[in-house]
């Protein structure tokens, strides 16, 4: 039995208007973001070597003046997080209204999820813990995850909304919470502690399609049908705007979309857009890599028919991702209209990434590769320099401590993450910042899981540094990718570099796999000397 497997068993899983080009209005800081830009009709380019690079951005905007950087972190009264579902960097950059955000705020280009799976990642966002610590390892109760597991472990009583509520902050969650909410425990009208305003679809319905769903709206069950005005994302956006307008106290708003998760729901106004787009033809697209791990090596190349189907999937995902831009637009417009843009931090990110045609895999997530684990993360607000890219290693475990610090709350000493507040004045990493982050895939999946796919890797643990991605699979396979010379992670060099270097990476990975709280911040700060010269690809 591999060391990773033994460890795991110990815990038991955003319109395209085809003839019109609109312009995003220039504004300072968080002024109204209400114009639209026509999505590109050509295939995405691959000029950018890093997942979050701003190369190729075509949005017409006026960046915020960042000439006067402050030595002290900016001060905010409110926080808004817009969380997408399954949004990778390639798709983000294809949506001009989303790509434009990189010129409005600070982009964290190495922001990594702890698990490329909805529920475990969302629990991490709330708890600032790796999944081996919060133990919600999958989407559904049957395989050790979902809302029932979160509640059974009583983690719903000690997480982000509770921490900021204690500081007098008014909280709201509109949209997706956790998979299988609210089956059984607490009942279908149940609202977890810490939330003052709550509009969350219950699991009995078709939330992912955007229609025919039921909202738990502050304890009242409200049924929505199939009319255009019933589209879930639009309903949630209106609730978010009303909350911003009506709340006079400091607030935390968590606006959580179901898009662009399959079946790639979108508003009627976005149907028929992005018709000329195709899935990104990166060097890894339908490719055969070098020295592939066993689970991947068995896949044949995708047929032309399958590739054409993937292009259709990509177009649907682009249409769906437009609704994420709608959500950001709604929030930004209301903040500007109410003057609350002057003291609000807005963070736009996602629970995990997604791949379409990577190697010979059709569509999905749950791999250690950057498409699935290195995700969009933008921080926008007064005092945050615009157009700045941060390449330091950050993680979803850092969101809760960041928001809690901004809002004047206190986090428990058992959290695994670090606050990102020190980055906000300039984008420079504070002293003793981490050198690596951990991603894990522990939980099993089955056909009742909304993210079930027959082609996922065996359980794994992965260590990601600014240069390297090292992964150990539970079937004994290992892989190492030099992202400096191989940004698409095609060449596994684990057998061709100094074994001592691989051993050092493995040792650090082992420490992170079993870390908890302060020991995570010790393990991720270990520095390992590169065995290869610093060269450009």
Regions from the language model: what does each represent?
Residues 81-84, 88-172, 183, 203, ...:
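Active-site segment of extracytoplasmic enzymes that catalyze sulfate/phosphate-ester chemistry
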Residues 161-169, 237, 241, 329, ...:
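Non-catalytic, well-ordered alpha-helical segments in soluble enzyme domains
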Residues 49-116, 488-500:
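Active-site-proximal N-terminal segment of extracellular/periplasmic enzymes that hydrolyze or transfer
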Residues 6-33, 40:
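Secretory targeting and sorting signals
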Residues 69-74, 89-91, 202-231, 244-396, ...:
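Active-site-proximal cap/lid insertion segments
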Residues 79-80, 85, 164, 176, ...:
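A short aromatic-rich beta-strand->coil structural motif
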Residues 193-206, 352-358, 398-400, 405-479, ...:
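C-terminal cap/loop subdomain of S1 sulfatases and analogous C-terminal strand-loop tails that border
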Residues 25-57, 67, 525:
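C-terminal region of N-terminal signal peptides and the immediate post-cleavage residues
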């Amino acid at each position: 039995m591999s060391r990773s497997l033994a460890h795991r068993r110990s815990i038991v899983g955003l319109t395209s208007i085809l003839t019109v080009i609109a312009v995003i209005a220039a504004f300072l800081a968080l002024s109204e973001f209400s114009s639209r830009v026509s999505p590109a009709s050509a295939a995405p380019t691959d000029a950018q070597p890093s997942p979050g690079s701003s190369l190729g951005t075509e949005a017409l905007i006026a960046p915020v003046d960042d000439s006067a950087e402050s030595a002290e972190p900016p001060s905010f009264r409110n926080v808004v997080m817009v969380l997408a579902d399954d949004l990778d960097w390639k798709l983000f950059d294809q949506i001009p209204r989303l790509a434009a955000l990189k010129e409005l705020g600070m982009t964290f280009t190495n922001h990594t999820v702890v698990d490329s799976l909805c529920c475990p990642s969302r629990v991490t966002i709330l708890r600032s813990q790796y999944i081996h610590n919060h133990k919600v390892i999958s989407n559904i109760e049957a395989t050790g995850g979902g809302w029932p597991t979160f509640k059974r472990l009583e983690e719903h009583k000690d997480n982000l909304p509770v921490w900021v509520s204690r500081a007098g902050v008014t909280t709201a969650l509109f949209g997706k919470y956790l998979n299988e909410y609210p089956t059984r425990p607490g009942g279908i009208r149940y609202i977890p502690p810490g939330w003052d305003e709550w509009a969350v679809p219950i699991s009995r319905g078709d939330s992912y399609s955007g229609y025919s769903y039921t909202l738990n709206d502050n304890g009242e069950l409200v049924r929505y049908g199939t009319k255009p005005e019933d589209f879930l994302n639009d309903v949630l956006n209106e609730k978010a705007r009303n909350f911003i307008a009506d709340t006079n106290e400091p607030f935390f708003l968590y606006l959580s979309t179901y898009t662009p998760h399959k079946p790639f729901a979108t508003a009627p106004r976005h149907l028929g857009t992005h018709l000329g787009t195709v899935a990104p033809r990166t060097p890894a697209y339908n490719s055969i890599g070098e020295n592939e791990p066993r689970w991947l090596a068995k896949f044949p190349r995708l047929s032309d028919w399958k590739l054409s189907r993937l292009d259709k999937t990509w177009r649907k995902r682009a249409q769906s991702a437009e609704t994420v831009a709608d959500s950001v637009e709604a929030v930004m417009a209301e903040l500007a209209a109410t003057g609350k843009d002057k003291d609000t931090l807005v963070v736009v990110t996602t629970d995990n990434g997604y791949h379409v045609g990577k190697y010979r895999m059709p569509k999905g997530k749950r791999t250690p590769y950057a498409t699935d684990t290195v995700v969009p993360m933008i921080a926008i607000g007064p005092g945050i320099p615009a157009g700045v890219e941060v390449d330091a290693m950050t993680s979803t475990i850092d969101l809760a401590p960041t928001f809690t610090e901004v809002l004047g709350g206190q986090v428990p000493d058992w959290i695994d993450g670090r606050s990102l507040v020190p980055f906000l004045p300039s984008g420079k990493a504070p002293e003793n910042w981490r050198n690596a982050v951990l991603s894990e895939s522990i939980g099993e999946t089955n056909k009742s899981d909304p993210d079930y796919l027959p082609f996922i890797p065996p359980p794994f643990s992965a260590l990601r540094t600014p240069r390297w991605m090292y992964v150990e699979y539970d079937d004994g396979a290992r892989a190492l990718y030099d992202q400096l010379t191989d940004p698409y992670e095609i060449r596994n060099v684990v057998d061709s570099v100094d074994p001592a270097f691989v051993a050092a990476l493995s040792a650090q990975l082992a420490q992170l796999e079993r870390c908890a709280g302060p020991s995570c911040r010790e393990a991720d700060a270990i520095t390992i000397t590169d065995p290869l010269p610093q060269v450009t690809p």
